[in-house]
Amino acid sequence: MDISLTGRSAIVTGGSKGIGFAIATSFASSGGDVAIVARGQESLDDAVKRIRQSAKGKVTGVAADVATAVGVQKAYDGAMAAFGKVDIIVNNAGTSATGPFEKLTDEVMQTDLDLKLFAALRLCRLVWPQMKERKWGRIINILNVGAKAPRANSAPTSVSRAAGMAFTKVLSGEGAPHNVLVNALLVGLIEADQHVQAAKKKGIPLADHIAAMTKDVPLGRIGRAEEFANMACFLASDAGSYITGTAINIDGGRSPVV
């Protein structure tokens, strides 16, 4: 099956590292034009350089903090200046803050909502009219399996992701008559910079950290970012033209719910 994004342009937030970088790379190597958005200019420049090595489409970087309305507007303006249109949105920016409810402050909750939920809402609001007008659009919200099966001590992350899943379903219903397809991809244990940082914080080797995490993964290993990106690329292409309003676990079978 040929997966092509030739002639399509995409915004990938949180696109300089991990899953976002893998998705941007997959899109670009499939012929799409890609604007990657990240806060750090140095990591952004490095990511753009690396993606261009295998890209068939254009690649640009936009330094912006999508946790703010100003930052989202900057990301949108950068993509429009580079490509003149946006066909695909990947709302990937976010962190995985967790902890006991009793220590969850309003500030921590709002920070997580701003980066995960409001960033997606604002970017979709900006791009939505042109997607409807062209009768073609793809929106992919990157959440995690906690959106379906939240565990104790998993707020604020699981709470904001659950809201993101509801947002996905609402948009899918409104977009379907206009061929704007909206889906969510739910992260399980996937290779990412956050695992490297977590291992450093614990003062243990990365391999030991990963081994402990993957004990309850039926496939017995951590997933590769490229494996996650493959599904995103499929959903963004014409090959995924009859899929909307769903949330797909990419977790090696770890989630207790389908």
Per-region residue spans from a language model:
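Active-site helix of classical SDR
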Residues: 124, 160-161, 168
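Substrate-binding pocket helix/loop in short-chain dehydrogenase/reductase
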Residues: 100-101, 105-113, 139, 209, ...
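Alpha-helical segment proximal to the catalytic Tyr-Lys
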Residues: 129, 173-177, 241
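Short C-terminal tail/terminal secondary-structure segment
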Residues: 1-3, 19, 149, 233, ...
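Conserved mid-core segment of classical short-chain dehydrogenase/reductases
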Residues: 73, 77, 96-110, 153-156
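Active-site loop immediately N-terminal to the catalytic Tyr-X3-Lys motif
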Residues: 101-102, 149-155, 177, 220, ...
